[in-house]
């Protein structure tokens, strides 16, 4: 800390101002404000962050000392003002808590009561954010013995004013000789660390991480130092290196990483104007700019900043893991420790952990840097890697060069890992944490910490990739197989499971570069296969899977799966059942590893339907595609069998069906046709709208809620329906719109509740939905109010340019309207209102919400059921949609892109 810094705080000038004022409050406030401005300017000018936070602590020391002098403390030997916690370490950020302990010698301290109260009142009046406690030395000992947080705070203390001897006495009575011996303290701190990590999902890669509390955050470094202080009395990282727990290079890395997080935290406090440690979307752009990250694309600048953040916290996490394991080996050592068991000439087990037999193993036999992970996969009883061996791995990573990568011993070992029955994900994760994976596969190293600034991808690319491999592995476990029965069944019968793991490793490896990441990844995958001398068939499959890993989900979510041509085109693209099996399993794992909330019953049903229909097409033969007429005949025949068994007159059925049109039978299965037909035939002629609701437990819709509406056609039918559903808090995931020749509308919606689940067995909720829709459709002139819901905080920060594309389908007499835009409450209801205003008919719709974005496809016609052909009409339609999409967006949102 500085001894003198007149620009920051001039004691003489301050005391002169105090003498001139009747009340000291104004002088104190002025000094604090001016010093804060100086420190913020120095931060913007790039002043050393360590110096800045020490300077702020020095400033507060001076302010507190001057405030202390304003009062008569009588017997000054019996009281002391002590800084504890972070302030006790001499570290203060702009809005950090100033933790104070007023330490008393005797329990009887009535003589100080009035001065203490007035002193604390002054601190609050001048705007200091203080946390204070008033204790005697004996009370400190009593509370420290009972509370881990209290003893931790007291270990980090400085006397600001009063008797230093009191603090020394406090340290003596709270030492390891009296309480919290180092072993007990270490176990408590380790448990505290694990609980804190679990609170933040045990990952360094949260979208909005906490720079203090998240894994790899500042609290991890502090935990290591607390344990070291309790065990060895070391005060800082440099001293920790002196004890042999850190190499000098590791000390420098940890210190620079801490400095980076200090800069981020300082900027957070400064921008938020309060003690804010969460790196929220609200602040990421501003902090990126403040710290010098720039790009023509602001989103890219944020991604660069966050990638640096994630890499820093990963480094901290790795080094703290290393130190904590060292502590375990030293502090927890007992008489039974030291048992070793040989594994091979290079490795042995030491108390259940693998270790190198000597310090030269990796230097003499570099292939051992891969062998160690294969051994752990082959011996699942191994608990982990000894700290010294982790350090040896880190020290010898530089030996992994092109010669190493092309050595057949190493390529064989790497492939061997993927053939192990268990431990693939766990050991790939270890390889990534120790920096081996990114060295062996430089293309993987590029995606470490690579984030995508959106709500769809909640993990960095490397974390997502390893999560995908974890999901693939879990598909073989019974609890998971019950949730994903088809994917689990297929995973169990893949001829070479290692190929899907390798495809998963490379599927997103091209992200963060210019160009199509699927194509870039396929190029990298091909080179990998060649370098590892994989058979030609294996290589072709891996490359094809990487290149096409998005095709199945895109087709399922954006195409009309009831159209035989869509199925036939997809089957032609896939080519054979083996590829289909691999692609389906990879797609399921990819979606679940991207964002768990994306996997809902409706998305599952779409993929399962596409898989089943494609499999049938492949077995029938691509030269014999199922045509529309054949599909209609099959559906009608099966539905009629159901109805006749239930006692329905076939003639009544035939008469009804003659009015429904071909599209109806193409878009519904036999069970639904029978369900609809039975209800329609029983509906009185003047019974009003027919609204049917059921849990769609059929194979293709399992778990969703299907709403079928049959009513006389009216111009505003879709607009009224979606507005009413918005009022009912329903999310529409699919819409099938059909108008019969008798001018009746037959609409089917697949909906989920706002929480992503189906309606379930909830008669009250079903009645609420049925009554709400019936009332809205019975009185369409009372158009349901589009509820103005608050845009969620996170959505506000993702204003990307909306895209509106209008094109005509050469094979079908419809116009396709594609909309990609930021998600906003009530958006679909607003689009429905536009269709009403433009006199448009909706024939079909595919609705998809992916994080903060919607990707919706509408199949529309004009009032005469013809495709849109007037360019001016299309232009006006686009403009109207654009206005709705941009309503409420931030002014810096990019222009909307329209295509026709």
Curated annotation (Swiss-Prot):
Its cofactor is Mg(2+). One of its GO terms (biological process) is regulation of nitrogen utilization. Keywords: Hydrolase, Magnesium, Multifunctional enzyme, Nucleotidyltransferase, Repeat, Transferase. The keyword Lipid metabolism does not apply. Residues 461-583 form the HD domain. Uridylyltransferase (UTase) activity is inhibited by glutamine, while glutamine activates uridylyl-removing (UR) activity. Residues 1-342 are annotated as: Uridylyltransferase. It catalyses: [protein-PII]-L-tyrosine + UTP = [protein-PII]-uridylyl-L-tyrosine + diphosphate; [protein-PII]-uridylyl-L-tyrosine + H2O = [protein-PII]-L-tyrosine + UMP + H(+). Residues 706-784, 816-900 form the ACT domain. InterPro entries: ACT-like_dom_sf, ACT_dom, HD/PDEase_dom, HD_domain, NT_sf, PII_UdlTrfase/GS_AdlTrfase, Polymerase_NTP_transf_dom, UTase/UR. Its EC number is 2.7.7.59, 3.1.4.-. Gene3D superfamilies: Beta Polymerase, domain 2 (3.30.460.10), cca-adding enzyme, domain 2 (1.10.3090.10), Nucleotidyltransferases domain 2 (1.20.120.330). One of its GO terms (molecular function) is [protein-PII] uridylyltransferase activity. Residues 343-705 are annotated as: Uridylyl-removing. Belongs to the GlnD family. HAMAP family: PII_uridylyl_transf. Has four distinct domains: an N-terminal nucleotidyltransferase (NT) domain responsible for UTase activity, a central HD domain that encodes UR activity, and two C-terminal ACT domains that seem to have a role in glutamine sensing. Modifies, by uridylylation and deuridylylation, the PII regulatory proteins (GlnB and homologs), in response to the nitrogen status of the cell that GlnD senses through the glutamine level. Under low glutamine levels, catalyzes the conversion of the PII proteins and UTP to PII-UMP and PPi, while under higher glutamine levels, GlnD hydrolyzes PII-UMP to PII and UMP (deuridylylation). Thus, controls uridylylation state and activity of the PII proteins, and plays an important role in the regulation of nitrogen assimilation and metabolism. This is Bifunctional uridylyltransferase/uridylyl-removing enzyme. It comes from Pseudomonas putida (strain W619). The lineage of its organism: Bacteria, Pseudomonadati, Pseudomonadota, Gammaproteobacteria, Pseudomonadales. The gene is glnD.
């Amino acid at each position: 800390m500085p001894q003198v810094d007149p620009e920051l705080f001039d004691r003489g000038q301050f005391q002169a101002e105090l003498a001139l004022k009747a009340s000291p409050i104004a002088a104190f406030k002025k000094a604090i404000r001016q010093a804060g401005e100086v420190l913020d300017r120095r931060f913007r000018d790039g002043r050393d962050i360590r110096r800045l936070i020490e300077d702020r602590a020095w400033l507060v020391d001076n302010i507190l000392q001057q405030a202390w002098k304003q009062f008569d403390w009588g017997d000054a030997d019996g009281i002391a003002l002590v800084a504890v916690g972070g302030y006790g370490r001499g570290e203060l950020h702009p809005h950090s808590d100033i933790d104070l302990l007023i330490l008393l010698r005797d329990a009887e301290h009535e003589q100080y009561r009035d001065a203490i109260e007035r002193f604390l009142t002054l601190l609050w009046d001048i705007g200091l954010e203080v946390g204070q406690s008033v204790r005697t030395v004996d009370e400190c000992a009593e509370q420290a013995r009972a509370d881990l947080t209290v003893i931790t705070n007291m270990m980090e203390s400085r006397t600001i004013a009063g008797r230093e001897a009191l603090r020394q006495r406090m340290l003596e009575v709270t030492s390891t000789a009296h309480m919290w011996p180092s072993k007990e303290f270490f176990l408590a701190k380790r448990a505290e660390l694990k609980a804190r990590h679990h609170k933040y999902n045990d990952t360094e890669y949260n979208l909005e991480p906490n720079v203090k509390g998240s894994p790899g955050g500042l609290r991890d470094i502090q935990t290591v130092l607390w344990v070291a202080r309790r065990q060895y009395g070391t005060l800082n990282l440099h001293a920790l290196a002196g004890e042999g727990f850190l190499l000098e290079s590791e000390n420098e890395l940890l210190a620079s990483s801490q400095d980076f997080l200090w800069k981020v935290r300082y900027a957070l406090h400064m921008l938020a104007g309060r003690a804010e440690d969460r790196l929220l979307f609200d602040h990421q752009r501003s902090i990126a700019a403040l710290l010098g990250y720039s790009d023509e694309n602001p989103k890219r600048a944020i991604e660069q900043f966050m990638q640096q953040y994630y890499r820093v916290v990963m480094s901290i996490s790795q080094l703290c893991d290393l130190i904590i394991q060292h502590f375990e080996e030293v502090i927890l050592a007992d008489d039974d420790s030291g048992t070793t068991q040989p594994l091979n000439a290079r490795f042995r087990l030491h108390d259940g952990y693998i270790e190198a037999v000597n310090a030269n193993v990796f230097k003499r036999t570099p292939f051992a840097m891969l062998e160690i992970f294969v051994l752990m996969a082959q011996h699942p009883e191994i608990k982990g890697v000894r700290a010294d061996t982790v350090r040896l791995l880190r020290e010898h990573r530089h030996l992994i060069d092109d010669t190493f990568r092309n050595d057949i011993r190493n390529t064989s070992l790497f492939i061997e890992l993927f053939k192990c029955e268990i431990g693939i994900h766990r050991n790939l994760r270890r390889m990534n944490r120790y920096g081996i994976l990114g060295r062996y596969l430089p293309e993987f190293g590029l995606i470490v910490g690579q984030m995508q600034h959106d709500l769809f991808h909640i993990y960095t690319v490397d974390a997502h990739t390893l999560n995908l491999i974890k999901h693939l592995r879990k598909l073989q476990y019974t609890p998971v197989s019950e949730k994903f029965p088809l994917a689990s069944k297929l995973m169990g019968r893949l001829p070479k499971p290692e190929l899907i793991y390798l495809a998963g490793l490379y599927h997103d490896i091209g992200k963060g570069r210019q160009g199509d990441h699927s194509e870039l990844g396929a190029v990298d995958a091909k080179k990998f296969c060649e370098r590892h001398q994989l058979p030609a068939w294996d290589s072709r499959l891996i490359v094809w899977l990487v290149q096409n890993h998005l095709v199945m989900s895109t087709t399922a979510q954006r195409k009309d799966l009831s159209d035989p041509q869509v199925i036939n085109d997809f089957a032609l693209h896939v080519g054979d059942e083996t590829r289909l099996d691999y692609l389906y399993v990879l797609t399921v794992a990819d979606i679940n590893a991207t964002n768990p909330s994306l996997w809902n019953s409706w998305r599952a049903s779409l993929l399962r339907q596409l898989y089943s229909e494609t499999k049938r097409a492949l077995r029938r033969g691509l030269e014999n595609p199922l045509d529309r007429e054949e599909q209609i005949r099959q559906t009608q025949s099966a539905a009629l069998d159901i109805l006749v068994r239930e006692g329905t007159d076939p003639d009544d059925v035939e008469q009804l069906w003659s009015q429904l049109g071909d599209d109806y039978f193409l878009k519904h299965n036999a069970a639904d046709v029978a369900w609809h037909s039975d209800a329609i035939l029983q509906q009185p002629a003047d019974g009003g709208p027919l609204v049917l609701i059921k849990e769609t437990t059929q194979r293709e819709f399992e778990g969703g809620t299907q709403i079928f509406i049959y009513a006389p056609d009216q111009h505003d039918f879709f607009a009224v329906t979606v507005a009413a559903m918005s009022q009912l808090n329903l999310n529409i995931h699919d819409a099938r719109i059909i108008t019969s020749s008798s001018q009746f509308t037959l609409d089917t919606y697949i909906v989920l509740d706002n929480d992503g689940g189906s309606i379930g067995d909830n008669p009250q909720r079903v009645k609420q939905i049925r009554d709400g829709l019936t009332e809205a459709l019975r009185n369409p002139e009372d158009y349901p109010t589009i509820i103005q819901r608050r845009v969620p905080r996170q959505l506000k920060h993702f204003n990307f340019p909306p895209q509106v594309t209008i094109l005509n389908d050469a094979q079908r007499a419809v116009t396709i309207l594609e909309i990609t835009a930021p998600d906003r409450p009530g958006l679909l209801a607003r689009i429905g209102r536009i269709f009403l205003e433009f006199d448009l008919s909706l024939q079909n719709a595919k609705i998809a919400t992916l994080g903060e974005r919607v990707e919706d496809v509408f199949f529309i016609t004009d009032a005469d059921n013809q495709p849109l052909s007037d360019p001016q009409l299309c232009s006006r339609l686009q403009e109207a949609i654009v206005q709705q999409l941009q309503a409420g967006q931030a002014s810096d949102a990019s222009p909307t892109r329209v295509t026709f």
